[in-house]
Every structure is written in structure tokens, then in C-alpha cells.
Design a protein with these regions (language model features):
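C-terminal cap of thioredoxin/glutaredoxin-like
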Residues: 2, 7-29, 34, 109-195
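Structural alpha/beta surface segment adjacent to cysteine/selenocysteine redox centers
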Residues: 14-117
Length: 195
């Protein structure tokens, strides 16, 4: 078992989300997709923004590196005008989708819209468009995503991520509690989970 801790605002979670399903299946590792919010974790570290915005050189490097990673994967990449984006609604919808068995498709589609097309997933119309593209009743799904149990689950996921020592996304946690951080550590996490 491997927990995949992801945040839609996380750039490197995009390629991880594209790769993790096939790589896990090939190794026989079961996955649990765990959406959470980075904002509260950053705030606890004294940051009021993404470190990629706080440190411009780091941000420039990240955007160039992400473009290279996407090119290597054959995945589209368009830098969004807004970064980081407000991902609360998309994260809540992801919890509904994961509970209903279509979460992986939804998550990959959100990442494709955000980093493959440069769209703002913080805008409700973008999430509606993703849901419509998946042939889902967007109004009904969004209504379910606004319920107190879903809101509480996202809050608890974020609190659990912090309690586990997660400080960024993507992060991967194995059944024995080993933490791996970053898209470039995905294979190592899967190999550890397979042991």
C-alpha cells in the first residue's frame, strides 16, 4: 500500500499523477490517493506563499524543470498565469470522486487543465468543465463536495499530512511509515512499498 499525498496547486504532483497509476499496477502496489492542502503546512513553516514565489531563482528553475519533465513524459505543459491556485473546491470534488470510484480520472483531468492547458482550477467554471468532460452531473457533484463531511475530510487529511511530517507535494507514504517527497522519488517509494 502506498498513500499518494497530492495538492492540485503542486506543480510536480502533475507528472506524479500521470505516472503513478501505471507504475503502481506494474509493481502490484495498491494506491490510496490523498488530497490535502499545502497552505496550512506552509503557514506552519512561516510562509505565506509558495516557496517557488518567495525565492524567484527557485521558481524560475522549477518552471523550466517542469517543462523538461513534461516533455520527457510527452505530456502537455502550459504555465498557468495564476500560481499557486485556490484548489479547495477541486480538492473537495476529488474526495467525492475518489469515494465514488472515478477519482483518479478526475485528478488527472484537473492537473491536465491546470498545467497541461494553463487554466485556473480555482475558477468554478474550470472544475465544472472537467466534470462535464468526464460525463458527470457537475451541479450534483459540486453539491456533494460542499457538504460538511467532505469539508471535514479535507481538513483532517491536511492535519494528518502535517502530523506525518509531510512538508510538500507530491509525497508518498508507505504502509510502514516511510516518507518520500517529490515526483523524482516516486519509483523509490513504490519499490519500498513493494518490499
Amino acid at each position: 500500500m502506498l498513500d499518494f499525498w497530492f495538492e492540485f496547486a503542486s506543480t510536480y504532483s502533475y507528472p506524479a499523477a500521470l505516472r503513478i497509476g501505471g507504475l503502481a499496477r506494474a509493481r502490484g502496489v495498491s494506491l490510496r490517493w490523498r488530497p490535502f492542502l499545502l497552505g496550512p503546512l506552509f503557514k506552519a513553516q512561516g510562509w505565506d506563499n509558495s516557496p517557488f514565489n518567495i525565492y524567484p531563482a527557485k521558481g524560475r528553475y522549477m518552471w523550466r524543470d517542469l517543462a523538461r519533465v513534461c516533455e520527457e513524459l510527452g505530456a502537455p505543459f502550459v504555465r498557468p498565469a495564476v500560481f499557486p491556485q485556490n484548489t479547495i473546491q477541486a480538492s473537495r470534488v476529488a474526495l467525492v470522486a475518489l469515494a465514488e470510484g472515478w477519482g483518479e480520472d478526475f485528478c488527472r483531468a484537473v492537473y491536465a487543465a491546470e498545467f497541461g492547458e494553463g487554466r485556473d482550477v480555482g475558477v468554478p467554471e474550470t472544475v465544472v468543465g472537467v466534470l462535464s468532460g468526464l460525463k458527470k452531473d457537475a451541479a450534483a457533484v459540486i453539491e456533494r463536495a460542499q457538504t460538511d463531511p467532505i469539508k471535514l475530510t479535507l481538513r483532517r487529511n491536511t492535519e494528518e499530512a502535517q502530523a506525518r511530517g509531510i512538508f510538500g507535494a507530491p509525497s508518498f507514504v508507505t504502509a510502514d511509515g516511510e516518507l518520500f517527497w517529490g515526483n523524482d522519488r516516486l519509483e523509490a517509494a513504490l519499490n519500498w512499498a513493494k518490499r
